[in-house]
From Swiss-Prot:
Role played: Catalyzes the attachment of threonine to tRNA(Thr) in a two-step reaction: L-threonine is first activated by ATP to form Thr-AMP and then transferred to the acceptor end of tRNA(Thr). Also edits incorrectly charged L-seryl-tRNA(Thr).
Source organism: Caldivirga maquilingensis (strain ATCC 700844 / DSM 13496 / JCM 10307 / IC-167)
HAMAP family: Thr_tRNA_synth (MF_00184)
NCBIfam families linked: PRK03991.1 (NF003068)
Oligomer and partners: Homodimer.
Protein name: Threonine--tRNA ligase
Listed GO MF terms: ATP binding; threonine-tRNA ligase activity; tRNA binding; zinc ion binding
Swiss-Prot/TrEMBL GO biological process terms: threonyl-tRNA aminoacylation
C-alpha cells in the first residue's frame, strides 16, 4: 500500500463522474466533503495488499502516529490510484479501503472522513508547508505479523453402502478395497507412492502426437494430426454424453479472458486462489480456469422460468491454470487444457440432489465403458453432511462400495458438495478425472435468476460437472488403461471409435496401389478413418509401423485380395482373420456404434506425407 500524507490547512472534494465501471456506491454524504487542519491520506491499494487485521492496524497506527505529531484535528482517507503501477482490482481495493476506514475510526480519538473509490473528483488542498506536512509511506503485508488462516477442522470418514460410518484410521480394508486404501493413504494420511520411473503412458502420448510446446509457457501442449482427431472426437462425444442426461443442454462458446474489475469475476477468482493466469492490456484480465465466467455472464441475461429448469449449458472451454512448473504433467496437469464444462441450473438443492444421482450414474457409466472404475472423494460442508447423510449413503450404495467423505467444518465455500472421481493409475496413484459439485453461491453473485410458480424471483442452484473430466485427462485415462493392460501381458489398444487410424491398407507392391486405394475409398465412404501405406518399404516394415500406431485393422492387399475380394486382415489383439469388405465394415460399425465419427486429419496416402515426429 502506498500513502502520501499531506497536513492541510484545508481540504475539500466533490464527485464528478465515474472512473471505473463498478465504482463504490455513492451515498449523499460521499458526494462531497471538507475539513480543516486535517491529515489527508492519499491511498493506493496494491495488488498484494489484503484486509488482514494485522496489516490494516499497522497502516492505521502509522497514519495516526503522523496525525498526532502534526496535531491534526481529523484524518481524511482519499483513494488515489497514481502512487503505484501495481493496482489492486477495484472490488478488492474497495474492500480494503473500507476496512482501513473502519480500523482508523476504531483506533482514532479524532474524526475520520473518507472519499469514495472509483469516481473522478475535484479537490482543493492547502498544504501547511512545515517539515512534517508532506510524507510518504510504502507498507506491505509482509511487514506485518504473519496472517493466520481461518481455523477449520476438516475430518474424514468412510461411509459404507449399508449406512455405517467409520474412522479411516481404524477401518479394516478388504482386498476389494485396495483402490479406496490408496485414496485414503493420499488424502487422509498424506502418503502417496511416487512413481520412480516414467509412466508408460507418456510414450503413448508422444506416439499419437500429444507433446509439450517448447516455444510457449510451461505446461502448454501441442497436438499433431492424430492427437487432433482424438480431441475433436471427444469434443463431440462430450456434448453427446451431456444430452443423454435427459435435460435440455445448450452448447455455447465465448471468450477466455475476463475483467478483474468486475465484482463478480473478482470474487469468483478469489475463491479459486493463486493458480490464476493474470494478463494485462488496458486493464487487468484473468484467463478463465473453466467455463464458469462465460456461461454465468451469458445466462444472467436469459429470462428464466421454473418451467425451463433444469437446464444445461456446455462449452468445451480452453482453460488456464497457473500450475507450478515442476508439477506439470503431460496430458494430465497442464496450464492450458480443454474442459467440457457442463453447468446445470436447477430450482433448489432438492432438485440438484435428484439430478446429481443421474450425473453420478453417467460418470460411472462412461469410465466403465473403457474398462476402469472410480474411487470417490466426497467433499461436503458440515451442514450438508449432518442433514443429508442418507444421500451420501445412497451414492455409496449406487457405487457398490465404501466411499471416502471429507467433512469441512468452520469454513465457508460456494459449494456444499464437491465430488472428485479418481482412477488409480499404473503407478498406484489416485488421479482425479471427473467431478461434480452443488454450487449455492454463484447464482446470486452473478445475478442469475428465475421466476418460480408464484412469480417470485429466485436464485437457482448450479451443478458444475465435467462428466468425462478434461479432454486431456480422459485421454490420459485411455492411455493409462492401455499401459495397465500391457503391464498385464495384454496388447495395448484404444477403443476403435477414438483410434486415430481405424484401418490401414498395405499393398504388397506398387502394382496393387490402385486396388488398395479403391478399397480404402469404400471404407472411407462408410465413415471410417483409413490410410494407405503406399511407401516404397517392405510389407514387414509397413505392418510394424501400423502396429506401432495401434491400428485395429491392418489389411494386406495383393493378388489374392484383388481377385477374390476376400481380405487378409490382421486384427489387433486377435491375429490374422479372413473376411470380406462387408464383414470388415460390419465389425467397424459394431465397434463404433453410439460414438461420433470424424474424418482423417491427414492425407490418406502415406507416400505424400513428410515423416511425422
Amino acid at each position: 500500500m502506498r500513502l502520501l500524507l499531506i497536513h492541510a490547512r484545508s481540504f475539500s472534494f466533490e464527485v464528478r463522474d465515474k472512473a471505473v465501471e463498478n465504482p463504490e456506491p455513492l451515498t449523499e454524504e460521499l458526494k462531497r466533503g471538507s475539513a480543516d487542519n486535517t491529515l489527508v491520506v492519499f491511498t493506493t491499494v496494491e495488488e498484494n495488499d489484503n484486509d488482514s487485521p494485522s496489516f490494516l492496524e499497522r497502516v492505521a497506527d502509522d497514519v495516526l502516529d503522523v496525525a498526532g505529531k502534526v496535531k491534526a484535528s481529523s484524518v481524511f482517507l482519499y483513494p488515489y490510484a497514481h502512487l503505484s503501477p501495481n493496482l489492486a482490482p477495484p472490488p478488492k481495493a474497495i474492500t480494503i479501503l473500507n476496512a482501513l476506514y473502519e480500523t482508523l475510526k476504531g483506533k482514532a480519538s479524532i474524526p475520520v472522513y473518507r472519499a469514495p473509490f472509483g469516481w473522478y473528483k475535484a479537490f482543493n488542498i492547502s498544504c501547511l508547508g512545515h517539515p512534517l506536512s508532506e510524507l510518504s509511506r510504502t507498507i506491505t503485508p509482509q511487514e506485518s505479523a504473519p496472517q493466520r488462516k481461518p481455523y477449520t477442522r476438516d475430518y474424514y470418514v468412510i461411509v459404507s453402502p449399508d449406512g455405517s460410518i467409520h474412522d479411516p484410521a481404524s477401518y479394516s480394508f478388504s482386498e476389494r478395497d485396495a483402490d479406496l486404501k490408496v485414496l485414503v493413504d493420499k488424502e487422509v494420511f498424506k502418503r502417496e507412492l511416487e512413481g520412480k520411473e516414467q509412466p508408460r503412458y507418456i510414450d503413448y502420448c508422444l506416439k499419437f502426437g500429444f507433446e509439450w510446446e517448447p516455444l510457449s509457457d510451461v505446461g502448454h501442449m501441442r497436438y499433431g494430426p492424430y492427437a487432433t482427431v482424438m480431441l475433436e472426437l471427444l469434443d463431440d462425444y462430450s456434448y453427446q454424453v451431456a444430452k443423454s442426461l435427459g435435460i435440455p443442454v445448450f452448447k455455447v462458446k465465448g471468450t477466455n479472458m475476463f475483467r478483474l474489475s468486475d465484482k463478480a469475476i473478482s470474487e469468483h477468482a478469489g475463491l479459486f486462489g493463486e493458480r490464476m493466469y493474470i494478463t494485462e492490456s488496458d486493464e487487468e484480465l484473468v484467463m478463465r480456469y473453466a467455463a464458469c465466467f462465460q456461461q454465468f455472464a451469458m445466462i444472467k441475461d436469459w429470462v428464466l422460468s421454473y418451467r425451463n429448469l433444469p437446464l444445461g449449458m456446455l462449452e468445451i472451454a480452453d482453460s488456464y491454470r497457473y500450475e507450478q512448473p515442476g508439477e506439470t504433467v503431460l496430458c494430465f496437469r497442464l496450464r492450458r487444457f480443454y474442459m467440457p464444462d457442463l453447468h446445470i441450473f436447477v430450482k433448489d438443492l432438492k432438485e440438484a440432489m435428484d439430478v446429481g444421482l443421474r450425473l453420478h450414474a453417467k460418470i460411472f457409466e462412461e469410465i466403465r465403458r473403457i474398462g476402469r472404475d472410480y474411487v470417490s472423494l466426497y467433499n461436503v460442508s458440515k451442514e450438508f453432511f449432518d442433514q443429508n447423510k442418507d444421500y451420501l449413503v445412497e451414492l455409496a450404495r449406487r457405487e457398490g462400495k465404501p466411499i471416502l467423505v471429507r467433512v469441512l467444518e468452520g469454513a465457508k465455500y460456494y459449494w456444499v458438495l464437491n465430488v472428485e472421481y479418481h482412477i488409480i493409475d499404473e503407478l498406484k496413484r489416485p488421479r482425479e478425472i471427473a467431478t461434480f459439485q452443488f454450487d449455492i453461491g454463484n447464482a446470486q453473485r452473478f445475478g442469475i435468476k428465475y421466476r418460480d410458480e408464484g412469480n417470485n424471483i429466485k436464485y437457482p442452484v448450479i451443478i458444475h460437472t465435467a462428466i468425462l473430466g478434461s479432454i486431456e485427462r480422459f485421454i490420459f485415462a485411455l492411455l493409462d488403461t492401455a499401459a495397465i493392460n500391457e503391464a498385464n501381458g495384454k496388447v495395448p489398444a484404444l477403443p476403435t471409435w477414438i483410434t486415430p487410424v481405424q484401418v490401414r491398407v498395405i499393398p504388397v507392391s506398387s502394382g496393387y496401389n490402385e486396388g488398395a486405394i479403391e478399397l480404402a475409398r469404400r471404407i472411407e465412404e462408410a465413415g471410417f478413418r483409413v490410410e494407405v501405406d503406399d511407401r516404397d518399404e517392405t510389407v514387414g516394415r509397413k505392418i510394424r509401423d501400423a502396429e506401432t500406431l495401434w491400428v485395429p485393422y491392418i489389411v494386406v492387399f495383393g493378388e489374392r485380395e484383388a481377385k477374390t475380394g476376400s481380405l487378409s486382415v490382421r486384427v489387433r489383439g486377435v491375429g490374422q482373420v479372413s473376411m470380406s469388405i462387408e464383414e470388415l465394415l460390419n465389425r467397424l460399425n459394431e465397434e463404433t456404434k453410439g460414438y461420433p465419427r470424424k474424418p482423417l486429419t491427414a492425407p490418406m496416402l502415406l507416400s505424400i506425407r513428410p515423416p511425422l515426429p
